[in-house]
Amino acid sequence: MATLKEVAGRAGVSQSTVSRLLNDPSFSIKEETRRRVLRVCEEMGYRNVFRPAIAVLDAPPSGEELQDAYFADLRKVLAERAESLELDQLTFIRSIHELTERATEFDGFITVGATVFPEADLRALHMVLPHGVCIDTNPAPRLFDSVRPDLSQTMLDALDAMIAAGRSRIAFLGGVGSIMGMHDYPEDIRELSFRQWAAHLGLETDGLVYSSGTFTVENGYRLAEQLVADHREAGSMPDGLIVAADVLAVGALQALNALRVEVPDELAVVSVNNQSIAWYTSPPLSSYAIDQRELARMAFSTLIDGLKHERRVRR
């Protein structure tokens, strides 16, 4: 069966033009071009499949190389998924204002990145482009859908693994994040889940949660340094440490090494993300993987489902 790309090539138009001509009755195009595209579709036996034009709202990078690497991997996975679905090439847009201005070019969008958008900007975008899926977090759950890893379950798994390994005094190291809704919170879901599950498991957390600042190597170093300063001389060192992200864990391991804390004998360390950098740390870092391919698959599936059925209930 002919592909969208082959039809577009023979007709001398873009893939998005073919897609919008076949799927959008209001799409304005020269009659000569319309007839040519339809003729090519018939000649090649092209069977129309809904292929929306999708933008990726790629929030500005944090400036932290390791954190940016996570989003770079995610962008690559999204592009690969779009290609496998035979969608037109994704359009990556850095500014929510630009996406709002160019809304008529797209059927929907997917967001990646850690930027927190103002409520007014999100509402303005929804007015002109109501179908969107946010990956990792959702700044406006009443307006847009979201696809997120189950970080609460990851925290429980990490705690269970620590306990099974004989660790009983377990600390947490994290940063400030945004969870759901149009608000900034002093905790992100990993810290909240750690506290919840630790309490459920009967573990002490007072004085063992170090969660402030940004998700950077430098901040990971600072927080681990503070943890050791608070507990080593007092004889209250934890024997386990769960870190919210690999980028923090790299800095934490550097600090622990500089302070001669034996990992994992004295302090077992696990992290979240399983980025490639985690494979080369010394000592090696145990890290729970986030399945980016599954996130991408679900993001496209959710967006296309919403577009096909004009779904108003957000996921």
For each feature predicted by the language model, list its residue ranges.
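N-terminal helix-turn-helix DNA-binding module of bacterial transcription factors
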Residues: 1-52
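Glycine-rich phosphate-binding loop signature in dinucleotide/nucleotide-binding domains
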Residues: 44, 162-166, 227-237
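Alpha-helical recognition/docking segments in bacterial nutrient-uptake
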Residues: 53-160, 164, 233
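Periplasmic-binding protein-like
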Residues: 55-56, 105-113, 171-174, 210, ...
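Hinge/beta->alpha junction and helix N-cap segments in small-molecule ligand-binding domains
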Residues: 60-69, 91-97, 147-157, 173-199, ...
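Flexible loop/turn connectors
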Residues: 229-315
